[in-house]
C-alpha cells in the first residue's frame, strides 16, 4: 500500500488514494443517517460532507489529470479544493438554469466522484508523496481549523441571515430559479448564480444538518 521513500517521505499509490477518496464519500453518506445531537457527531457529519463535496471531486480529477507522475499531498488537496469549487459552481449554474434540486445535483456529483475514483484505482501509475514538512503544515492547518470551527461565523447581522436563508432555500427547493432564490418572492438576487451558497447547500443536504449550522461553522 505504501512504502518509505528516501528521507522523511512516504509514497502512496494513486490506487490507495482513490480508495481513500471513496471511503470519504461513503463516510459522508453514512454519517448522514447518524444523529447530530452530540457536538462531535455534528462535527463529524459536517467535516465528512465538506470533504466529499469540497475536496474529493477535485482531488480525484487532479490524480486523473496527473500533471506529474508524483504529486505531493498538499498539491492534491490544494488542487482538489480549487477544482471542486469550480465544479460546484458549474453545478450551481446547471441547477439554476435547468431548475434541478440539490438531491439530484448531489447524486450527479457522487456518481462523477465514484467513476473518477474507480478510474483512479484502476490506473497502475502515479504516486502521492507525503513529506514530514507537509505533515507539519497540515497539523498547523488542522489546529487552526479546530479553532475557527469553535469560533464560528457571525449570523446575527441581517445580511448574514439573508445568506443563511438563501442557503436554506437552495438546499430545499426542488426547482431553483433566478426569481425564487431570494427571501422576497419574485425578486432576482444580486448574484444570479450564488456558487458559494450552493456549496453550503450541498453540504447541508448531504450531512442532513441545518443550513444555519453549516453557515455558522
Describe the residue ranges of each PLM region.
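Membrane-embedded, hydrophobic transmembrane alpha-helices
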Residues: 1-130
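Generic detector of bulky aromatic hydrophobic side chains
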Residues: 72, 89-93, 101, 136-142, ...
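Active-site lumenal/periplasmic loops and adjacent helix-entry segments of GT-C-fold
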Residues: 133, 140-217
Amino acid at each position: 500500500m505504501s512504502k518509505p521513500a528516501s528521507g522523511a517521505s512516504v509514497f502512496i499509490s494513486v490506487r490507495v488514494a482513490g480508495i481513500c477518496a471513496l471511503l470519504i464519500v461513503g463516510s459522508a453518506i453514512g454519517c448522514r443517517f447518524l444523529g447530530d445531537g452530540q457536538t462531535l457527531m455534528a462535527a463529524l457529519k459536517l467535516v465528512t460532507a465538506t470533504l466529499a463535496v469540497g475536496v474529493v471531486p477535485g482531488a480525484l480529477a487532479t490524480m486523473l489529470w496527473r500533471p506529474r507522475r508524483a504529486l505531493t499531498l498538499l498539491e492534491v488537496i490544494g488542487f482538489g479544493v480549487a477544482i471542486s469549487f469550480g465544479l460546484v459552481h458549474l453545478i450551481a449554474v446547471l441547477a439554476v438554469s435547468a431548475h434541478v434540486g440539490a438531491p439530484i445535483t448531489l447524486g450527479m456529483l457522487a456518481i462523477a466522484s465514484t467513476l473518477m475514483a474507480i478510474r483512479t484505482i484502476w490506473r497502475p501509475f502515479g504516486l502521492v508523496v507525503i513529506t514530514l514538512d507537509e505533515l507539519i503544515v497540515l497539523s498547523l492547518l488542522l489546529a487552526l481549523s479546530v479553532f475557527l470551527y469553535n469560533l464560528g461565523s457571525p449570523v446575527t447581522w441581517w445580511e448574514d441571515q439573508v445568506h443563511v436563508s438563501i442557503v436554506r432555500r437552495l438546499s430545499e427547493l426542488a426547482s431553483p430559479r433566478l426569481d425564487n432564490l431570494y427571501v422576497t418572492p419574485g425578486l432576482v438576487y444580486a448574484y444570479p448564480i450564488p456558487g458559494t451558497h450552493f456549496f453550503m447547500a450541498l453540504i447541508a443536504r448531504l450531512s442532513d444538518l441545518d443550513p444555519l449550522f453549516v453557515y455558522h461553522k
